[in-house]
Every structure is written in C-alpha cells, then in structure tokens.
UniProtKB/Swiss-Prot annotation:
Signal peptide: none annotated. This is Glutamine-dependent NAD(+) synthetase. Catalyzes the final step of the nicotinamide adenine dinucleotide (NAD) de novo synthesis pathway, the ATP-dependent amidation of deamido-NAD using L-glutamine as a nitrogen source. Pfam families: CN_hydrolase, NAD_synthase. GO terms for cellular component: cytosol. It catalyses: deamido-NAD(+) + L-glutamine + ATP + H2O = L-glutamate + AMP + diphosphate + NAD(+) + H(+). One of its GO terms (biological process) is NAD biosynthetic process via the salvage pathway. The active site is at residues 45, 114, 175, 357. The gene is Nadsyn1. In the C-terminal section; belongs to the NAD synthetase family. Residues 5-275 form the CN hydrolase domain. ATP binds at residues 355-362. Pathway: Cofactor biosynthesis; NAD(+) biosynthesis; NAD(+) from deamido-NAD(+) (L-Gln route): step 1/1.
Length: 725
C-alpha cells in the first residue's frame, strides 16, 4: 500500500446563478486536478450555484438547477477516477442546508451539511439555511429521481460523517466551522481523520489573510494532519470580493499557496504529501493521544478507493514554504482592481467614467483602474485566453491584443475634470497631468452654465438669489449653493457616461465610478446624489489613511510623480469661492476633525461596538497626551451629532468594494436607524457628568478626593427628570 497522497484544492471565480459558467469552471478544475495526479479534488463553498445568491436560495429553481448541475458532473467522464467534493444547497426533509456532496465514479458517497453558519458582518446564512446540529449522526437522504436514475442509488448518508478510503480518512469542515471555538477538525483529528477539507466562501478584508493562514496552520500544528482550504475568488455579484488564498498545509506548515488576487477564473493547487509524516507527528504528541482515547467516534462511510498509489517510492513529495503576504497598499491595488474587472466584463459595459477632481480620492480610483489595466495586460501576456476574449468583447475588436496598460486605459477609462468658478488652477493641472500619465481619455468641462441655469429657475420662481457666506449669505444659502454644484456634476457624469462613446462613434456605455472614502461616508461628509452617487465605488470601503498610503505606493510602483503633488495638496471640495485665487475651503476644517481621528471613531463605533459614552471613556486614555477630557468630549459629541444627522445618506450610498471592518454600508454590513435624536441627550449628559467629575477631581486636594470617593453619586436619571413647577 502506498503512503504518498496527491490532493487538490482550488479557487474558482464563480458567479451567483451562472449555472452554465459555474459548471464549466468546476469541470475544468477537476480536469486540471486529474492532470496533476490528484485523487481528491476540493472546491469552494456553494460552488455550483455561486455563494452570493442571497434570497435566491429561497427559490426552488436554485435548488433544482443545482441538482441538474450535480447530475451533469456525475455523468461527465471528466469526474471519473477522482473523488470530487462539491458545494451546493440541498433540501432535506423540507429543511434547506448548505452542503458538501462527495462522489466518485457516478456514486454519491455522502452529503455533509454545514454545522456552524456565518451570520455576522456581511453574512446572513441563517436567513437561508439551517445548521446541522446532530453531532456524529447521520440520516438517509432520498435522492431526487434524476439522480437515482443516474447513480442507481435510492438513498445516501446525510449528516456529520467522515470518509474512510483504503489508505486514510477524510473529514469535512465548511468555512465558518474553522473560525468557531470548537471546530470540527479538533475531534475529527483526534478520531483518526488525517485529511481535513475546508470549502470556504471567504471575502477580502484588508489584512485578513494573516488570520486565515494562522487558523489553518494552528489547526494542523496542535493536532497534526493535512488541511486543504478552497475558496471562491472574484466578484460574484455584489460588494464582496472573494480573495482565493487556497492552500494546503500539513503539521503546521504550508505546502501550497494560491494567489489572493488574480484574473484566472480557475486556479488549482496540488501537493503530494506522505501520510506517514502525519502519523508520526500525531503519535509523538502524548497529550493529544490521551485526548484521542476519550473522543467519541465519527460514523464512517467506507469507499473502495485509495488516494495513494501502490508504487510511490520514487514520487517526490512537496516541500514546506513560507506564506507570502501582500502589504495593505498592494491589497488595495489588486483587490478592487480584480473586482472592477469582474464587474466590467460581466455587466457588458464598455468601460468606466470617472470624475477626476485632482484630489487623493478620485486619484486613488483612477490608479485602481490603471492597476486593473496592468493586470489585464499581464494576464494576456501569460496566455490567459479568457481575459483576452473578455477584453476583445469590451473594446468590440476581435483582433485586439492589449500590450500597453496606458493604451488599454485609454480605451476603458474616460476621466473628466468638471470645473466651476470655485475651482483652482492647481486641481485642474493635477487632474490633467494624472490623466496623461495613465493614458485615460480625458475631458475638461465647466459646470458654471448649468449652475447658473438651475439658480435662475429658483430665482425666477422665488424672486431671491442665494449667496455664499463669503458674499454675505447665510449658512443655508452657502450649503445649498455647494450642493447645486455637486449634484450637477452627478447629472453630467451620467450623461457623459451614457453618450461619451456615442459621440466618439464607439458602441456601448460606461459605468460611473464613485470616489467617496469610508471615513467621509461614515461622517456623511458628502452631498447626497453628488459624484459620490455612481454605479460602483472601488474605494468606498477604504479609509483615507490607507488611501494615502496606497497613492504613495502607486506613485512608486507605476512611476506617477504627479501623485506626490496630489498627496501634498490640502484636501478640499472646492465648492466655495476662492480667496485671492487660492482655495479657502479645507475638508478637515469643515468636518471639525482630522481623517486620522475619523478612522479611530469609525473603528471604535463598529469594531469595538462603542456608543458615545463608551467611546469617550476609551478615548480619554487613548488621547490623554493630546487632549483634555473636555476636548475629548467635544470631539466625541461632534462626531456622533454629525454621524446621526447624516446617517440617512447611507441608505442611498453607491455599492462599494468592501474592505474595512468599520464600513458604514447600510445594505447588509452596518444595520442602523437613519432617523436619530441627534442631540443624544442622555448619552451626552453621561459624558458631561464624567468631565465635571474629572475636572473637579483635578482641582481637589488629596483629602477632598478621598471624601468625594465615599459620597453617593447622584443617579443620571434624576438630572433628566422634569423639574417640579
């Protein structure tokens, strides 16, 4: 009997409800795995229908078409002589489960339902599925007739079960189960399971790869064994980008690493590993062995098939390797770029339209598109036929082969500087120079005529003409005049996106890109239905701090020196009149806080789950060397006042690439009301009382502080009760 096994895992760019495309990608991955000598192939979570079907899981069609794809896979000669592990939704006794279906040679060996469902952040699995809660128990699943006719089986095992081959034992985890405190791999490993598989639907978040790799290596470090992780990759229909990172680990070390960001629709990893290395590693850990004697056994499905071959002495084994991580700046350069590529080719539009202001945010969006063009050119040069076909379809030229990212950018990206009488020459120059360097088709236009026309209608109807504060107007007039400019830019962006190519004699329309960052969205520092309103936003989930680091990275990586000028310029909306030809409006002055402070507020609010009072308490210590308690209180109250006042803007926010755990995305990730009492009277009074106590304590002698300590504090609610008449 052999001792070396060759196993395969993969990352597939599946698309929700694209059953034909998903089927072909699954089939191709199996074919590649067999070609590399693998005897077991693992695919991503729910790969047959695509992970992001959301409420389509409620539809019987989704279940039906998934079964049809499974039948097609079972019937294909490609799937013969290799154990195939695929993911799909299954209805069992009128309950819907997220399942793995494991089959070999037209026979379904077992169905393993997911036991721990992801239901936080962007995940809502409990809305569509039920977890299997019967540990180490199985039932008989009655196959639909279309499968009975094909497999000649009436029922198959369904439940928490492992697979015993002639030479080893394989157990399944599904995505979230790896992240739970009591992961199934622990008991499975103690019960003699030597190979653990994990089919994931895990999306990208900046700096998340470290956690994923640590979980896998730790799982095999404490308990020994081989661990395969498969994941989806790409944009499968919404704000999330699934970032691959397929991997194979053994005994705490990585033996195969997949790409995190790639335009390849199918990526297959294989490793040849020695089962005796697993057995000797496990047997040496005496504390593990003692626990193994107490573990309850798993039901086993046996199969007359081996993952090893009998004559394998000369078969080379894979070597351990160090995982290569991307810097956050690289992640921003690659993740959103791949997401944009998927969105563009699958939407069948002809390119992007980007309002380019000359500031950091729109420059970052432009750089992401340029990075996308670089990835496309590299993929074509490496022989990726699918990318070549896609780009030929986009430019409507069957003989076209992209060679230069700048030339491709000129075909796919139209940028536009929309000047007003409040715009400076500096921002105009920076926008024009950046467009020249990346090669985009660039337009310069003035919005003043449109602004005057809109204000003329208002003046005609009311007999009044609003003025800026600099010209003696009120704050209401000042804000209205700023918003008119911003909203006209949005209208013009959509007009030019729809007709720009038509005016040039080319086919198709363009997707409008937004450039509002996550910090400005959190505070509401944007005009509702301005240029933040777009089709998609590649930077909407990224903080200003990370964006500045990313733009600095692009300046060096892509040799774009104008980005240094953009970084050194003050952030400004340029919606108010210039003062002696110079910009007088600064973003951080308008907001009343710095972008760095705003990032801290965002993380405390969402990640640390801090309301106004808790945030104040945390910041007292964090900012003790920079601000007094009174100043901290003022900043916290200002943030929550503005945040709650502007929360309604999140309900119409442009769909943005999800990249941060403190995103205020109202769609699914950050569910909050949008009508608040913006005075926060109870919460702010708690803060004010704490400030008074701190100030009083600072002015007291030591004896007075001791006496104060033993006084009964006045309850907060007594201060809020109505006073007696």
């Amino acid at each position: 009997m052999g001792r070396k096994v060759t196993v395969a895992t993969c990352a597939l760019n599946q698309w929700a409800l694209d059953f034909e495309g998903n089927f072909q990608r699954i089939l191709k991955s199996i074919q590649i795995a067999k070609g590399k000598g693998a005897r077991y192939r693992l695919g991503p979570e729910l790969e047959i229908c695509g992970y992001g079907c959301w409420d389509h899981y409620h539809e019987s069609d989704t279940l039906l078409h998934s079964l049809q794809v499974l039948a097609a896979l079972l019937d294909s000669p490609v799937t013969q002589d290799i154990i195939c592990d695929v993911g799909m939704p299954i209805m069992h006794r009128n309950v819907r489960y997220n399942c793995r279906v494991i089959f070999l040679n037209r026979k379904i060996l077992l169905i393993r339902p997911k036991m721990a469902l992801a239901n936080e952040g962007n995940y809502r699995e409990l809305r569509w599925f039920t977890p299997w809660t019967r540990s180490r128990q199985t039932e008989e699943y009655v196959l639909p007739r279309m499968l009975q006719d094909l497999t000649k089986q009436k029922t198959v095992p369904f439940g928490d079960v492992v697979l015993a081959t002639q030479d080893t034992c394989v157990g399944s985890e599904i995505c979230e189960e790896l992240w739970t405190p009591r992961s199934p791999h622990i008991d499975m490993g103690l019960d003699g399971v030597e190979i653990i598989t994990n089919a994931s639907g895990s999306h990208h978040v900046l700096r998340k790869a470290h956690t994923r790799v640590d979980l896998v290596t730790m799982a095999t470090s404490k308990n020994g064994g081989i661990y395969l992780l498969a994941n989806q990759k790409g944009c499968d229909g919404d704000r999330l980008y699934y970032d691959g990172c397929a991997m194979i680990a053994m005994n705490g070390s990585i033996f195969a690493q997949g790409t995190q960001f790639s335009l390849d629709d199918v990526e297959v990893l294989t490793a040849t590993l020695d089962l005796e290395d697993v057995r000797s590693y496990k047997a040496e850990i005496s504390s593990r062995n003692l626990e193994a004697t107490r573990v309850s056994p798993y039901p086993r499905v046996t199969v007359d098939f081996a993952l090893s071959v009998s004559e394998d002495l000369l078969e080379p084994v894979s070597e351990p390797m160090e995982w290569t991580y991307h810097r956050p700046e690289e992640e921003i350069s690659l993740g959103p770029a791949c997401w944009l590529w998927d969105f563009l080719r699958r939407s069948k539009q002809a390119g992007f339209f980007l309002p380019l202001s000359g500031g950091v945010d729109s420059a970052a969006s432009a750089c992401i598109v340029y990075s996308m063009c670089c990835l496309v050119c590299d993929a074509v040069k490496s022989g990726n036929q699918q990318v070549l076909t896609d780009v030929q379809n986009l430019v409507d030229e069957s003989s076209y082969t992209p060679q230069d990212p700048r030339e491709l950018c000129g075909r796919l990206l139209t940028t536009c500087y929309m000047a007003s009488e409040n715009s400076s020459q500096e921002t105009h120059s920076r926008a024009t120079k950046l467009a020249q360097l990346i090669g985009s088709y660039h337009i310069n236009l003035s919005i003043d005529t449109a602004v005057k026309a809109v204000l003329g209608i208002f003046s005609l109807m009311t007999g009044k003409l609003p003025r800026f504060s600099a010209h003696g107007g009120s704050s209401r007039e000042n804000l209205a005049l700023q918003n008119v400019q911003a909203r006209i830019r949005m209208v013009l962006a959509y007009l030019f996106a729809q007709l720009s190519l038509w005016s040039r004699g080319a086919r198709g329309s363009l997707l409008v890109l937004g450039s509002a960052n996550v910090d400005e969205s959190l505070l509401g520092y944007l005009t509702k239905y301005d240029c933040s309103s777009a089709d998609i936003n590649p930077i909407g989930g990224i903080s200003k701090t990370d964006l500045r680091a990313f733009v600095q990275f692009c300046a060096e990586r892509f040799q774009l020196p104008v980005l240094q000028t953009i970084l050194s310029a003050p952030a400004t909306a340029e919606l108010e009149p210039l003062a002696d030809g110079q910009v007088s409006q600064m973003d951080e002055e308008d907001m009343g806080m710095t972008y760095a402070e705003l990032s801290i507020f965002g993380r405390l609010r969402k990640v640390a789950k801090a309301g106004p009072y808790s945030m104040f308490c945390k910041l007292l210590n964090m900012w003790r060397d920079s601000y007094t308690p009174t100043q901290v209180a003022e900043k916290v109250k200002l943030f929550f006042s503005k945040y709650s006042m502007n929360r309604h803007k999140m309900t119409t926010l442009t769909p943005a690439y999800h990249a941060e755990n403190y995103s205020p995305d109202d769609n699914r990730f950050d569910l909050r009301p949008f009508l608040y009492n913006t005075r926060w009277p109870w919460q702010f009074l708690c803060i004010d009382n704490q400030v008074l106590q701190l100030e009083r304590k600072a002015s007291q002698t030591r004896e007075e502080q001791v006496l104060e300590h033993f006084k009964e504090p006045s309850p907060i609610w007594k201060q809020l009760l109505p006073k007696d008449p």
